[in-house]
Amino acid sequence: MESVSHLVSNGQSVLLVWSQGGQLDTLANFTSSLRERVGTNGTVAVENINRLSQSSYGSSTFDVALSNVVSSYCCKHTSEQLAQILKMLKPDCKCLLRDTSPSDQIRSELILAGFTNISIVAEDNATVKVNARKPNFEIGSSAALPFANKISLGGNSKMETAKMWTLSSQDFVDDDIDIIDENTLIEEDDFLKPDPSSLRSQECDSAKKKRKACKNCSCGLAEEIESEKKTNGNPVSSCGSCYLGDAFRCSSCPYLGMPAFKPGEKVALPSRLLQADV
């Protein structure tokens, strides 16, 4: 009891956490000593460390939390158990615990759980005794920042802000306001249709490589190439002289006996030439 007498006083609510392996007689005697210390106005709640998450105590219930301080048996606290103890403590209240983790590790675990003012009270080869404190605010609470205060404008700030962004109808007849004429934003040259050759990329006019329209061509090269394909799509014979007449035709030319025609002219063969010889 001497080791915790400076933490417990009359009228306080104390959370006593014990673990499996501890002697029940020692736990009962220690609990009785705590109840004598807090008096009739205080309370002592005894909870097993493995059942903290199932306890019915709410947030900010206890003034002091004592964990694993009853007997020589000690265990390692998990991050969930430390967070549960922090939740049950009132703001700016202390916690005394013993743990089997190294001092640096248990200090880090307590910091991650939300404790502050962590100090190592005693340490030996197997256990470490640590004092920690819950911050002087509730978990999840909020506070207004000093620079977030609104600056007074000498009146109603909302009305002043609305007035700042309001354009009065009287402003349109004020001679001091320079209003841009929308007709001056576009010049006469902007209405002229541009020459397609001026819109064509330099790569389109390159003579070193085959002309090929770009994807989503907008300079007119795609339409020009398409029209050239239609113009140059005339039938061409293997010898290239069928249109000159029989004197220039091969012996197997299907145009034998037909008059000469113009290059590219569509010529219909007689039906007798389309029938197979028997």
From Swiss-Prot:
Notes concerning its domains: The C-terminal domain binds 2 Fe-S clusters but is otherwise mostly in an intrinsically disordered conformation.
GO biological process, one term: iron-sulfur cluster assembly
Protein's UniProt keywords contain Mitochondrion: yes
Entry binding sites for [2Fe-2S] cluster: 204, 214, 217, 219
Keywords: 2Fe-2S, 4Fe-4S, Cytoplasm, Iron, Iron-sulfur, Metal-binding, Mitochondrion
Family to which the UniProt record says this protein belongs: Belongs to the anamorsin family.
Protein name per the record: Anamorsin homolog
Lineage: Eukaryota, Metazoa, Placozoa, Uniplacotomia, Trichoplacea
Residues in coiled coil: none
